[in-house]
Amino acid sequence: MSVEHATPVQQPAHAAASVRPVMILAGGTGGHIFPGLAVAKVLRARGVPVTWLGADGAMETRLVPQHAIQIDTLAISGLRGKGIVKLLGAPVRVMRAVRAAGFVLRKRQPRAVISFGGFAAGPGGLAARLLGVPLLVHEQNRAPGMTNKVLSRFARRVLTGFPGSFAGEEAVGNPVREEIAALPAPATRLVGRGGPVRLLVLGGSQGARALNNAVPAALAALGHPAVDVRHQCGEKLRAEAEAAYAQAAVNASVEPFIADMAAAYAWADLVVCRAGASTLAEVCAAGVGSVLVPFAAAVDDHQTRNAEYLVSAEAAVLLKQDDTLAVRLQQVLQTLLADPARRLAMAQAARTLAKPDAAERIADIILQEAGNGKSGMGNGQSAEQLQEHTVIHQNKRTDQALDAASASLHPIPDSRFPIRTSAGGAQ
């Protein structure tokens, strides 16, 4: 499909035609999409309709319609590793994508737009700015992505999951599921708990080969301590994980997916996991100590930056992914498995970092900005007046602004916009 046109994936499902929606820009990975869905749930519970802008064929086109949310898409994709010809042609494609996004905004008439990151967020955010629609940014990671870096320059409010991402930020946290935030305090769960230590290993939806290999090896080297292991490994790496535990003669419950994560966190005494923003938000909300192994190939090493925040609060231990991981994990587990007081202290420290009301706070701020001054979309005009106004507006302002806007979004080898991550790869 040509990038000049936006594709409606699902028809509007607004509660009331007279109520203008909030538009969410998010896609590419679950780390962008799921926080957006959490905020959408809060907004819709308040009677505010939600619309979504994503990228053709990306994950959001499958997930968002499952929640009965209308989604439009742009033909925008990643250029990392695509060669110099693709990079040289990027400014034209970005300008076309911004125009296509402007078409969607004029059609949907959102009262406010919020970017959670992803391929379509850059064009969508720039179009919102050019059309005078209140724009907000929510950055999940401590090391912000290129798209949100650009949009933060002219967003009305810049919200973050962790402190230390932007000057002038508002660290509201990353949304987590209500049932996780509602778990009892660590002292209530952990004090006096008997039996083997309960170790929860989380590899994410794609699995983590480094954890599949290191955890069984570390436990075997410890001489098979009294520990119950529950290892979530992803469907594609299930056989590999089961074989690793069998070879190490370590008993473990290996699961491709855990449906009830709240119950899993409540069960756990200690977690070994990656350091994605959503996972760490859940670990903190649940109140459980963790051993963090950041994904070594993460863009801008953002998982290490995330992990360092928990380490600075003594809520986690950070281990680098390299050839010595199994040995260093053995050393860390040898200490933590034998020290329930330290595990409790880590869990309590994690809980102090939690922001369980993040989705509510983000929704509050969106609606504050939606009602803070006049937006360029609407202001009581009829549809015909609005169309005439926006066409004139675009002709006079948009074309001149697009060159500068696309230049700031032009992807270079170190950029994150727009970047297509490899699909289905084990991390």
From Swiss-Prot:
Keywords: Cell cycle, Cell division, Cell inner membrane, Cell membrane, Cell shape, Cell wall biogenesis/degradation, Glycosyltransferase, Membrane, Peptidoglycan synthesis, Transferase. It comes from the Bacteria. Its EC number is 2.4.1.227. InterPro entries: GlcNAc_MurG, Glyco_trans_28_C, GlycoTrans_28_N. Pathway: Cell wall biogenesis; peptidoglycan biosynthesis. Residues 408-427 are annotated as: Disordered. Cell wall formation. Catalyzes the transfer of a GlcNAc subunit on undecaprenyl-pyrophosphoryl-MurNAc-pentapeptide (lipid intermediate I) to form undecaprenyl-pyrophosphoryl-MurNAc-(pentapeptide)GlcNAc (lipid intermediate II). This is UDP-N-acetylglucosamine--N-acetylmuramyl-(pentapeptide) pyrophosphoryl-undecaprenol N-acetylglucosamine transferase. The keyword Membrane applies. It catalyses: di-trans,octa-cis-undecaprenyl diphospho-N-acetyl-alpha-D-muramoyl-L-alanyl-D-glutamyl-meso-2,6-diaminopimeloyl-D-alanyl-D-alanine + UDP-N-acetyl-alpha-D-glucosamine = di-trans,octa-cis-undecaprenyl diphospho-[N-acetyl-alpha-D-glucosaminyl-(1->4)]-N-acetyl-alpha-D-muramoyl-L-alanyl-D-glutamyl-meso-2,6-diaminopimeloyl-D-alanyl-D-alanine + UDP + H(+). It is a peripheral membrane protein. The gene is murG. It comes from Xanthomonas campestris pv. campestris (strain ATCC 33913 / DSM 3586 / NCPPB 528 / LMG 568 / P 25). HAMAP family: MurG (MF_00033).
